[in-house]
Every structure is written in structure tokens, then in C-alpha cells.
Amino acid sequence: MDPYASAGVDEEREQDVFATAMRPWLARTTVRSQLVTSITGLASGYFATLMHVPPGPPIALTTDGVGTKILLAREADRWEPVGIDCVANNVNDVICTGAVPLALLDYIATDRIDAAVLEAIARGLYRGADLAGIAIPGGEIAQIGAMLADSAGGGPMLDLVGTAVGAIPDGRSPVDGSAVRPGDVVLALPSSGLHSNGYSLARRALGPRTRELADALLAPTRVYVRAAEALWAAGVTPRGLAHISGGGLLNLARLAADVSYTLDALPPAPEIFALIASAGDVPAATMYATFNMGTGFCVVVSPADAKPALNALTAAGEQPVVAGSVTARPGRYVSIPAAGLLGQGDSFFPGGSDPPHTPPAHGGAARPPIPPRDTV
């Protein structure tokens, strides 16, 4: 059984149920609005949804939570990082459309009111909002103790979720990855660690060591808004933007172009990933399909824009690396030669051979993966 599924996260089942049982109903809602006159062609599975509400610009919408990282925050009684995570997870998805994040609403479900905990989360939300340049004009606290059983004592049991909105500035076209071409350059921005994904597997692998590794495990998700805006300010038009969250580097396959990616010079992975792999005997294919492995965000640019993009990102405080390139191979494969892995859809496979998936008959292109709806 897949180690991540054994840890309680069955991604394949989740994606199948979303595609067959939920998406057909949710898709129908878009035809009922009297305000929305057009919806961009972003495929279901992209990082955020773009909607056009005349007379204003296209707006980007997304929602995400912090997942079971909250259990480690509770264990360590360190809540501020998850507030930052809540903001980062959402705004990093918004910027993948080319939109500028504007605001976020937060939702906290808790078994009881603990003023110190809520203040720490609020500080984290503030810090994240400051890094992203957004407002948090409202939110909700729901006291649902009957639904959140406290089985281990200690601080409150809670869940933290955000919904973010952004807008495409005048004169800027939305980004969906359809402009990506073979020969384009993939730039990678380092992560701070796990960010907010794979914590069910990490907790299972590390067991009681999570306490001694709290500093590494609770490092907040990096916010890449300033980096993205630095590109536009420098006159660089990115052809693709990918938030490397749940699903790891396979998130590149969510870009619209039917191409593939070879990543042969990724940023170094923080030590915490090797500790998880060793402690839990987790194979490389699962590690790369679950965690970001040291890369938090990818930017795809034309060869002519590679140097200006590197300069702009460096000036914005990033440490970008030229991670690889785009190839003409159809099917949206992601190759990581150094790890001996080739991936497609939601899985990596060892040995560099073709994965046991075939593109669907309609159109010959592999379906982009459904958005990882797990920050667990």
C-alpha cells in the first residue's frame, strides 16, 4: 500500500471522488450567476479559478487550509506559523494565474475559545498578510466542540482555512501555462521545508521525534507574492507559474501546455526530508509525489527572459536556480534524473521508464491532475 495512503491520505480515491461525484455538480453553478459573463478557460485542476465580473478585471479565487500541521503546532504550543501558512497557501495559488492577491477571509473551527492560541494565530495571519501585501477584512470563528474531539489533552483542537481573492491588473493577460513552449527555462525558488503538505506522512514516519524536530517541521510556508510581482515589474512575462505544494513537482503538469519537464538542477532539499525518508522507509517516488523536496515555486520563462527573470528574483530577495527545461514530449511528464524518477499525473515512478499510464483517447493529451485538495 502507498505509504501516504497508509498514513490516512488516499489521494487517488480523493481525486476520483472529486472528479466523479463532486465536480459535475459544482460545475453547474457557473451558469446560474447573472453577474459572471465569462469564465476563463483554466482547466479544473489549476491553482486558482479566474472569473470575469464586468465591468471590473478578472478576479482570482482560491481556498485552502493548513491541514494536519496544526497537530504539530498544538503539540509544540506554537501557533503563529500556521497563521502564516494559511495566508501563504492561498496567495501562492492566486499568483499562479497572474493575479495580484488582494484579500483573504479566514475560518477557524475550534472546540473551545483559547485567547492565547487565537491571538498567536492572528499574529501569524498578520505576518502572512504583511508579506503578501493583502488585507484580512473579516472571517469566522466556529465553536464546534461536538465535532472536534480532544483525545490527547493540551491546547484546543481546531482547523484553519482561508479563502483568497485577487485581480488581474489592467494590461496583464492571465497566466495558465498555455504559452509554455519546448526549450523554455524552468526557474525554481527554494522552500523553507515541508511548507503545509505531507504532514500525515511525516508524522507517521517520525513518530515521537516530531517534538525534537519542531523547528524544522513548523517552519512557515514561504510567500512568493513579491517574487512574482518583481517579474512583472522587470518586464518579464512568465509563461507558467506553479506553486509546488501537494503533489510536489508534479504541479508543473497542471500548466495547460501539453509538454514535459526535465528538472536536473533543483535547489537542495532541507535535511528534514532525508530524515522523513529514512525514519519511515519512504521510497523516493513517494517522497517526490508528496513533498516539495526543497522547491516551493517554479517559474517558466522563455530563454530570452531567463537572465532578466533571475536578476529580478534575486533583487526581490529570492535565491532562484535554473532547475531545468521544457521538452517537446507530450503527456505532461516530469523527469528528475538525479532521483531516477519520471512522473505523470499524481505519481512518480523509479528507473526513468515510462509510467504505467496512457493518455486518454480524446485528443491524445494526458489530463492535468485534479488539484491536490489536501494540505495534510
Where are these regions (language model features)?
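Extreme N-terminal cap/leader segments of soluble proteins
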Residues: 1-78, 126-138, 188, 218, ...
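Glycine-/charge-enriched secondary-structure boundary and capping motifs
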Residues: 2-8, 116-135, 141, 147-158, ...
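Glycine-rich anion-binding loops of enzyme active sites
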Residues: 45, 66-67, 77, 85-86, ...
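Glycine/charged-rich beta-loop-alpha catalytic/anionic-binding loops adjacent to active sites
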Residues: 65-78, 106, 209-213, 259, ...
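Active-site pocket-shaping loop/turn-to-helix segments
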Residues: 76-84, 214-223
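Alpha-helical scaffold segments that flank or form the walls of functional sites
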Residues: 81-97
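Alpha-helix C-terminal capping segments
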Residues: 92-100, 254-255, 301-302
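Membrane-embedded hairpin module used as a gating/binding unit in multi-pass transport
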Residues: 192-194, 199-209, 224-227
